[in-house]
From Swiss-Prot:
Protein name as catalogued: Protein DSE1
Similarity-based family: Belongs to the WD repeat DSE1 family.
Lineage of source species: Eukaryota, Fungi, Dikarya, Ascomycota, Saccharomycotina
WD repeats: from-to residues: 98-142, 147-186, 228-266, 334-375, 379-418
GO MF annotation, one: snoRNA binding
Short name of one Pfam family: WD40
Keyword check for Cell wall biogenesis/degradation: yes
PROSITE patterns registered for this protein in UniProt: WD_REPEATS_1, WD_REPEATS_2, WD_REPEATS_REGION
Cellular component GO terms, alphabetical: fungal-type cell wall; Pwp2p-containing subcomplex of 90S preribosome; small-subunit processome
GO process annotations (BP): cell adhesion; cell adhesion involved in single-species biofilm formation; cell division; cell wall organization; filamentous growth; filamentous growth of a population of unicellular organisms; maturation of SSU-rRNA; single-species biofilm formation on inanimate substrate
InterPro entries associated with the record: WD40/YVTN_repeat-like_dom_sf (IPR015943), WD40_repeat_CS (IPR019775), WD40_repeat_dom_sf (IPR036322), WD40_rpt (IPR001680), WD_repeat_RBAP46/RBAP48/MSI1 (IPR050459)
Composition bias, Low complexity: 571-594, 648-662, 699-713
Compositionally biased intervals (Polar residues): 714-724
Region (Disordered): 569-596, 638-667, 699-724
Amino acid sequence: MTDYYEPTFLFRQNAIKRFSPSLSPISSVESLSLVDSNSISNNGTTTTTTTTTSSIYQNASNSSWLLNPYNVKDTAILNQSCCLNRTNVKSNYWKIPDESMNLTSMSINKNQGGNPILAISSGKSESNLFIYELNLFNNHLIHHHTISLPNIHAMKWINNTRYLVTGNNKGYAHLVSTPKLATHDVFNTNSNGDFDYNDDDEDDNNSAEICKRFNHRKHLKQNQLENTISTPIKHLNFLNNHENLLSIYNDYLFYWDIKGCHQQTRPSPISISTVSGIKNFDVPEKNHSSTNTSSANTVAICGLFGVSLFDLRDCQFNIPNYNTAQIHDKTQSSYRKLSANIVKWNPMNTNILAAGHGDGVIRLWDIRKQDSYIAELYGHNNYSITTSMEWNNNDLFTGSKDGNIIHWDLSNISKDSQWEENDNTKLPISCGLKEGFNSIEFNGKANKLETKLDQYQCGTILPASNSSIVAMCSTTTTTSSNDHDDEEIKILSIDSSSFLGVHNKVSESINVNINTNKLYYTEEDIQLLLQSQLNNNNITSSSATGSNDTLISFGNNVSQDSLVKPLTISRKPTTTIKNNNNNTTTRPTNTHTHSASIDESIVSVHNVSNDTLVNSPTRFNICESEDEFTFNYVKNNTNNEDQRQSDNRNSSFSSVSSQQTQLNNSVESLSTVVTDVENEVNHQEHKYMSLLLPVKDTSTTTTTTKDNNTNSDQAVTNTPIISI
């Protein structure tokens, strides 16, 4: 009998078999523990010391059906299903001050020559437009402005300018001039001279202003407004190098001339197209590597009708006839499979576009094969609506209402011959996740994982939020490594909990092997530590050049508030002399002239690092007033007259010191008063001061003095500098 309770075996076979090559298929559970214990005892002492970890695991419990965490084949299923192998995904989050938690849209301005500028909007009626500057290298989010522009539901920046277009829930789109930023000259000026509005008034540059208003409801007939439900402006975007504006209001697609709008008091649209059930559109980006030579007036639209191409010159739209093999009936699943709520062109190949459909599946379409899609991406929860998509070369990032962002690596799929062949009889390519329960195909007989032959595993899931992903955008940063520059993509997301997330290095996970029995550093570990320490020293020495000019130049990409670095006050070294009467005299360590200040305190200015503040080697000496001084006189065998003179001097210094001490207490000063009064002491006390040797400011030294009454040496120790 055991000393503790053991549950009975409820199952004849384990749900996940424990891997053991020495166990035959017909062996019992008891034989498994016997084999393991015999193998350890027969191998002697050497085997016992080398297998300490496994023996600890076996002695922890007699229930040998438990999985061995130190056996790779035992944990392969759990690691892949629970995404335990992912170690190189980093996310940073900031809370957006929106009490209603109703964030609606996000737009990023690349801001060539500076940090990207981020605009986040809310559906509130006031204080609902937030302008931020994002420092991607130090992961700093700097708030610049908060603007009241009620009920924003869509917006878009005009790149390299401080103008953006917003759309609200009442059918108005506004061209808004945002205030200038104090630290970015490139963002404050127009790049190519376009949209050159009057910027001579400094007061106007420091406030937001609505430059133009685009009224959508005004240009619709009264019967059209009565028969439709009023909805906000769903989506807007620029085309033709920011010369034209496209916007969706209700079931209408508006086409505006944004370049010539300043010549019109009330701008009118170029065309209005009726597209029943339209939800989104996308404009192909101009790229020299693109293989499509179609007109720039062609846009991709999606909605209840599915995915279609729209020619702005024709302004007519008819629902296409889908007679595909995949959609052959009118069931609910087929309807969801047909409808789409978001579409995005591939900037590297404008023949390819991605669409998020109502059944939660991302489908890739080739405009040269209009009868069917070419690939399906399964990763989000069933019927979870895809809210945003971003391309990065051949990588696709999708965000959904399930709170997940999935990175799809389509580099291998794009090399597949099916992408270029015009044979419509081939089935679409199926893509799944690398990790998660859906990625597991377990062979019970062989006790190992198997790869699905009919599916590419190219999706990496990132649990970005516990709520819905509202919007998403991307930006790139350039990092120098060796002799070339690498571009690293950053994915920005906002969710329904009013959090802004920045996710980087979303790539294939790295397999990190950690040896728990490792006791000593290897030669490679020492070299890595030395190299890391050398890099940190180089960064610290280069950033701490020790002048206010360097401090300002370091803060070129930050706001004025962040230029104020935190200060620390250090303790000045002092000396103490002890005698036989247990009296202590505080002596100064430095000698100064009468014109010099008596007191000095060292103020250290810290440089900003990514996560923590470290002490800078550069220190600035700031002279303080001569009032801070305390002096406790040591009684000795002298005449009364000399003692009275010394007491008078001591009282005069003490009175001045008390006033300054009260001032220091009010500001909670941490500096130690150090003064030099050698020239003020009477020549009769010179025999005491001659025993005190000068001490350096920044080092801890010890001097020896001899008392008059005894011949024993007394140690005089300087207190080292202590940073608070």
